[in-house]
Structure formats: C-alpha cells, structure tokens
C-alpha cells in the first residue's frame, strides 16, 4: 500500500497504481533456530517461552556488564540500529530526557551518522547508571541486549520489512514500533507489542509510558512476552506465502 503513495514511491506511484494487480507483499522471516534463547550460546543464561527465569539472569548480567544500576524492576528500553535519520532517532532525541525522568534504563547499540554517535555518547555521560551508548557493531552484545532488555524501540520513519522487531519478539523483548511498512504488518497491539501511528515524538513517548506502566503488572506482562516469543516469524511461514503466490501465477 505504501509504495502506491507519492511520498514513498518518489514519483513512481502512477506506474505502481496501474500495476497494483501484480503486487503482493510478503514479509521476510528469521532463522528461528539461530535466534533461539534456549540454545543461543551468546546469552548469559538460556530460557524459553515456557520458562523465562533465564531472562532475569540475562537482564541482571547485562546491567552489570554495561554499568547500569542493578534493578530487576526497572525496565530496560533498547535500540539496536543503524544511527540514521530514517530510523526515527530524531523522535528519540526530542523526548529521551523526559522519558529518563521515569524509572527506566536505555541501552543503544549501533553506528552511523557522526552527529547521532556523538549525541548518544553525551547522553550516556549525562545519565550514568541509566544509559549505555555502545557506538559499535557487536554481534555478541546484540544478542545479550535482545535477551536482557524488556522493551525494544523501533520508531522508524520508513521500514520496508525490518527484522529487529521479529528477533526482539523471539527473545521475549516487547517491541514498540511505528506503524510503517513491515513493522505495521508484524507487530500488533495487545498481541505481541505496541505501536504508534504518527511520526511524532510525543505520540511515541505516550506509548513508551503505556508499556512501562504495563510492565509493572508482572502477570499480564509475562503473557505478552509469551505471545511475542511464540509469534511465528520463521522462514517456513514466508516460504508458504511464496509457494502460494507461485501457484496463483501458474493459473494465468
């Protein structure tokens, strides 16, 4: 639907609309065995959707490793992203100081545009014990963050599909995404995460605070974690969608 819109199609929308009967959108998938907290050797402790006890260990050890205050009841909001404008970082920089007045911690992993690298590095210096900015690419640390965080923030301006929100779900870390592209197609409120529609910093902050409030209800949060972790984002599902499409094409 988005590529039929002039904003996203960059002038090609008339052609796309004329040929929309030829279009079919299929989500990417992830390696559900490669991203499996029960067997992932990068984690501080294994766990599964049936038993999240190991995730508590992962969180405590992540806090220790990154120099964050050791607090099991403080939700960790994480971003693993390329530091680029279209990833929604201007929304984060607008309201993160306000968000950090609440009982939350913030962890960032990524590299990219130098002004964002510097900005988040300075943020970590201003909030010792609450913020960890890791300006690097580190596959091992990314797994530790996926497993140790509570909330995964992905406020992209545009995102054709996105994989990070799927990986976060697999590790029982609840995504907050903006409703664009594949993020809208993969994350559904009350089912496996939180969403907001408008590209607006305060709309994002409202949803973050909603999630942080819900986090305090441990029983309901555990149910949300289970639903997220058991969402089928495997390539098996995507492959079936491709197979169905190919069969439909053979009819013409």
Indicate where each model-derived feature is located.
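Catalytic cores of nucleotide-sugar-dependent glycosyltransferases that transfer UDP/GDP/TDP-activated
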Residues: 1-252
């Amino acid at each position: 639907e988005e590529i039929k819109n002039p904003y996203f199609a960059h002038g090609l929308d008339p052609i796309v609309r004329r040929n929309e009967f030829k279009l079919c959108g299929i989500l990417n998938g992830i390696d559900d065995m490669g991203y499996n907290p029960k067997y992932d050797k990068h984690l501080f402790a294994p766990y599964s959707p049936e038993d999240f006890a190991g995730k508590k260990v992962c969180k405590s050890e992540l806090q220790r490793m990154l120099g964050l205050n050791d607090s099991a009841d403080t939700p960790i909001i994480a971003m693993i992203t390329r530091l680029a404008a279209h990833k929604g970082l201007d929304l984060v920089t607008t309201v993160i100081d306000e968000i950090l007045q609440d009982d939350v911690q913030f962890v960032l992993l990524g590299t990219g545009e130098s002004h964002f690298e510097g900005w988040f590095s300075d943020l970590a210096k201003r909030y010792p014990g609450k913020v960890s900015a890791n300006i690097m690419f580190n596959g091992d640390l990314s797994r530790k963050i996926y497993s140790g965080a509570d909330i995964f923030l992905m406020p992209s301006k545009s995102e054709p599909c996105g994989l990070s929100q799927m990986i976060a779900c697999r590790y029982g870390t609840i995504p907050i995404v903006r409703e664009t592209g594949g993020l809208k197609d993969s994350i559904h409120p009350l089912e496996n995460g939180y969403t907001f529609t408008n590209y607006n910093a305060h709309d994002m902050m409202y949803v973050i605070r909603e999630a942080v409030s819900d986090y305090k209800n441990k029983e309901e949060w555990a149910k949300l974690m289970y639903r997220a972790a058991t969402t089928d984002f495997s390539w098996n599902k995507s492959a079936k969608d491709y197979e169905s499409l190919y069969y439909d094409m053979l009819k013409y």
